[in-house]
Amino acid sequence: KEAIDWVRKNAERGADGIKFFGAPPDIFKAALIENKKLGLRSACHHAQMDVARMNVLETARNGLTTMEHWYGLPEAMFEDKTIQNFPLEFNYMNEGNRFEEAGKLWKQAAKPYSKKWNDVMDELISLDFTIDVTFVPYSIFRDVQRGSSLPWHKNYTRPQLLKFFLPSRESHAAAYYDWGSEMETEWKNNYKLWMTFINEYKNRGGRVTAGADSGYMYNVYGFGYVQELELLREAGFHPMEVIRAATLHAAEAI
């Protein structure tokens, strides 16, 4: 009831929608359902500590409009588990642990074009669900040396931001302080599976939009969005499909 009242008050104040991160399932469902009843839109970064309780398929069924990143999407396609296969010493608050294990997630989901993979994709499309991909921020994990030495940083990235980007145990997502070829290989393979899903989602009529999530991991505003468009092209989008994701489909989503 408190969640429903909160959503109604949010609408009364003139909000266009709500950005969610996660909540206990009963509260999350009530808020999503009421938000949709009121004709408002919704977005969600599915917090990794909540996806075992509410993955993307479950939030979409309850009225979620769009998702960001990929959190909660592979989890919806698990066939032999309900929680990612974390090592026993995993510590979510350790950024190195968090992002190293994130690079091993997509291979734990159903294989591309398998029944489970197809069923999840087709249901999301039937729900008119939008995926806002944000390929670019995580691309640093495929090649840290390249990402940290891109030519525009010298002239366009503020010194304070460059300092924040340096490998660190404190700065969010600057997780490459103990990084090497094995992690980068995992992430390259992770991207292949992620991009396969996104490209096929688009091919079947699903709405995909471009988002940069700049401000972290050598991902700078302005430049990051162009990189995102390039990564959609890498995923298999035709150049016109890339432009549509950044324009028409983005407008439809909001």
Model region roles, listed by residue range:
Residues E2-D5, E241:
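An acidic, carboxylate-rich microenvironment
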Residues V7, F28, L32, V51-V56, ...:
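Generic hydrophobic/aromatic pocket-lining and core-packing "Φ" positions
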Residues W6-G17, L73-E230, E234-A235:
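Active-site neighborhoods of metal-dependent hydrolases
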Residues H238-A250:
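Mid-to-C-terminal alpha-helical segments outside catalytic/metal-binding sites
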Residues K1-A3, A251-I254:
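Short, intrinsically disordered, charge-balanced linker/junction segments flanking boundaries
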Residues K1, A15-N97, Q108-K115, G211:
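Active-site loop-helix segments enriched in His/Asp/Glu that coordinate
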Residues F28, A52-M54, M77-F78, F141-R142, ...:
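Short secondary-structure boundary/hinge segments and terminal tails
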